Amino acid sequence: MNYGLTGLARAKARAKRWYHQLFKAIFGSRPVQWSKWVQNTYILHLEERTDRFHALNKELSKIKTTKGTLADEVTWFPALRDVEHWPAGEHIDEYSFEFHWAIDPDPWFYDHIDELADQTIDCSHAETAISLGHIRMWRQFLESDAEVAMFLEDDVYFDYQFEQKITSIFEKELPEDWDILYLGALPNYHGFTWDPHSKNLIRLYNGVWWMSSYVLTRSAAEKLLDNLPIVGPVDVWINYQFEYLNAYMTPGNLITQTGMTDSDNTYSFVQEYY
């Protein structure tokens, strides 16, 4: 999801990607022990988006692991499109203004909050499909014998220091009781709350968008599925789950959205209020 990447932000993302590609070419990288830390890697992918498949597969091939490259260790998970029917216990495709605003309390709405709070917003078809896609990936993870899994959307690229920083994070910095690790996220302007933790990690409490690059433990996936349905967009709902998840985040994205391809998502809150 490219929430927030429009105009100048998209141009900056493209420039940053070029910068990272240049530095990666200059300095190279060392193989990482990926399967030691993350046993399964899933990519939520619309099969007709062959442009994204080729771009991300090329990116993954640059990440060297002790088994080859990261491209050799991923599962391309088919995304849904234009879903009209799904189990009632999985997703509620409407949410209130207050449900979103509590995560990102934009002061622009203060004078009208009483009249806006209970207004209902319908999710876009894409938001529903994405939410259901993440649920299905979590379930497939739990059907495996893996203890840790990474989940990607198909429009991302890797920071040129990814290998160095991810090694430090998994070997030295993550506490034993972690549940979810964001390797890329978009902090919102008004609700982002966190504490410092270590050189490459912060402890996250609230206020991030994107579900395009994150890592879950098995117990975290179980907790998320136990707390279904997802209400509204998954990257809004997940913030409410931090109450029982030990959430961490890299303060500078190690994996970020490219801004290079057109988004297949429509953002219901943005369409309704901005």
Predicted stretch roles:
Residues 3-152, 156-274:
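An acidic/histidine-cluster motif and surrounding catalytic segment
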